[in-house]
A protein has these predicted regions:
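Hydrophobic transmembrane alpha-helices and immediately adjacent juxtamembrane helices
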Residues: 1-168
């Protein structure tokens, strides 16, 4: 199984870089959108939850950072599974012409979602600096849950991609 991943690593790299270029090709701000989008969403959620629902007195220190962490992980899971779900159907013309393992396409979408998530962590760092949250070496502990979420999202994406071939709704 690992031999198959290693054999198609260049194809995977080319597919991820193609998606990256296609996403930001016609955009004026380019990659800045990957940072700006989570920042603006966090600002809206923070305004709603802190003022309208009075979450300031809930005992959560640095509520904006707390909110941003959850938002980034959810956005990654959402993007990885929703794009992975339709990836095999989207690659059907290529799959009919050349033999490529079908798992490459959901894996590529999950890798691309991880690239976007890494850019979004810049937004988290900006929120941490703005709110005065301390940066500790323990921030490296986020790597294990992120890798676990990657594989979980990949599994869900593979399952949904297989189901979408039969049930296109």
């Amino acid at each position: 199984m690992w031999n198959g991943f290693w054999r198609y690593r260049y194809l995977l790299w080319n597919l991820v870089s193609r998606d990256f270029k296609l996403k930001y090709r016609r955009s004026v701000l380019g990659v800045v959108w990957s940072v700006l989008n989570p920042l603006l969403m966090c600002l809206v959620y923070w305004a709603v939850f802190s003022s309208l629902m009075d979450m300031r007195g809930s005992g959560i220190d640095n509520f904006a950072v707390f909110l941003m962490c959850g938002q980034l992980l959810f956005n990654f899971f959402n993007e990885a599974t929703s794009t992975g779900m339709s990836s095999v159907l989207g690659a059907a013309p290529l799959l009919k012409k050349v033999y490529i393992p079908k798992y490459i396409f959901p894996l590529e979408k999950c890798c691309f979602a991880m690239v976007n998530c890494v850019f979004s962590f810049v937004a988290l760092a900006l929120v941490m600096v703005f709110t005065g949250s301390p940066l500790h070496w323990t921030i490296l502990e986020v790597l294990y849950p992120l890798v676990t979420l990657f594989f979980f999202s990949l599994g869900v994406g593979l399952f949904l991609a297989a189901a979408t071939v039969f049930f296109r709704d």
